[in-house]
């Protein structure tokens, strides 16, 4: 039977969602090409965000369905990108809650969809219930989500270098923000930084060493941390640097 024009159009419309389906039929995971966005976002711009007035108002159960009474987020991956390192954290620390914070809407949507797909694929084991992602501006709203001394670890992996001097104030590491990070970090908590830009690395080290509430881990201490090897290529940006045979600059700091 030959389809009429109307029937052919209906069939085409019915097939279109399959063609545009952002989920891979092979892996069951979302495909990045449907979530592409510019590499960086202006953190000073007046983006429209919903954010809690205080940490007590955060509905963590909506992000972590299996959260236990009194359990809190322990790790924050600030600027988590496409979530590669966040997934690694979930696998390495199944008893800890990790949050990814990402300012770009399409990228954060991808991470949310990725986590949902991983949870469906691991329904029999209950894996990946301990990771979540939220779209927010960590440079403005971090204290709205975390209480004093709550976090054990914070990660700043391959942040935007903002090369122009006039934009250095946009860098995620600066003196004012370091005090906010110290507020939400517990004593002894760790800040992990990694970049492939040497100038930014020197900037980070200088500012953190000048701040009275941080001290840099020795090379021996950093190498003994089981997280350190994962910092190089667990994230998508890190893996790209490895593929391009680029340099990595690592610095880890302890909250005093």
Curated annotation (Swiss-Prot):
Residues 1-25 are annotated as: Disordered. Keywords: Methyltransferase, Nucleus, RNA-binding, S-adenosyl-L-methionine, Transferase, tRNA processing, tRNA-binding. The keyword Repressor does not apply. Pfam families: Methyltransf_4. The keyword Metal-binding does not apply. It is an enzyme of class 2 (transferase). GO terms for cellular component: nucleus; tRNA (m7G46) methyltransferase complex. The active site is at 160. It catalyses: guanosine(46) in tRNA + S-adenosyl-L-methionine = N(7)-methylguanosine(46) in tRNA + S-adenosyl-L-homocysteine. PROSITE patterns: SAM_MT_TRMB (PS51625). It comes from the Eukaryota. InterPro entries: SAM-dependent_MTases_sf, Trm8_euk, tRNA_(Gua-N-7)_MeTrfase_Trmb. S-adenosyl-L-methionine binds at residues 79, 102-103, 137-138, 157, 235-237. One of its GO terms (molecular function) is tRNA (guanine(46)-N7)-methyltransferase activity. It is found in: Nucleus. HAMAP family: tRNA_methyltr_TrmB_euk. Catalyzes the formation of N(7)-methylguanine at position 46 (m7G46) in tRNA. PANTHER family: 3-DEOXY-D-MANNO-OCTULOSONIC-ACID TRANSFERASE/TRNA GUANINE-N 7 - -METHYLTRANSFERASE (PTHR23417), TRNA (GUANINE-N(7)-)-METHYLTRANSFERASE (PTHR23417:SF16). Belongs to the class I-like SAM-binding methyltransferase superfamily. TrmB family. This is tRNA (guanine-N(7)-)-methyltransferase. The lineage of its organism: Eukaryota, Metazoa, Ecdysozoa, Arthropoda, Hexapoda.
């Amino acid at each position: 039977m030959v389809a009429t024009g109307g029937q052919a159009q209906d069939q085409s419309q019915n097939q279109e969602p399959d063609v545009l389906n952002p989920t891979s039929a092979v892996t069951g995971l979302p495909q990045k090409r449907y979530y592409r966005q510019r590499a960086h976002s202006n953190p000073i711009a007046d983006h429209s965000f919903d954010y809690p007035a205080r940490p007590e108002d955060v509905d963590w159960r909506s992000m972590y369905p299996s959260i236990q009474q009194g359990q809190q987020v322990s790790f924050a991956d600030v600027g988590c990108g496409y979530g590669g390192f966040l997934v690694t954290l979930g696998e390495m620390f199944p008893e800890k809650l990790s949050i990814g914070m990402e300012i770009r809407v399409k990228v954060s949507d991808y991470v949310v969809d990725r986590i949902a797909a991983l949870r469906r694929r691991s329904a029999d084991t209950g894996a990946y219930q301990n990771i979540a992602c939220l779209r927010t501006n960590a440079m403005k709203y971090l204290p709205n989500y975390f209480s004093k001394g709550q976090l054990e670890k914070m990660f700043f992996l391959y942040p935007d270098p903002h090369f122009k001097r006039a934009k250095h104030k946009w860098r995620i590491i600066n003196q004012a923000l370091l005090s906010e990070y110290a507020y939400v970090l517990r004593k002894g908590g760790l800040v992990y930084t990694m970049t492939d830009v040497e100038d930014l690395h020197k900037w980070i080290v200088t500012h953190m060493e000048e701040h009275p509430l941080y001290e840099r881990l020795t090379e021996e201490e950093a190498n003994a941390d089981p997280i350190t090897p994962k910092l190089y290529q667990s994230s998508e940006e890190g893996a790209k640097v490895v593929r391009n045979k680029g340099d990595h600059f690592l610095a880890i700091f302890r909250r005093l």
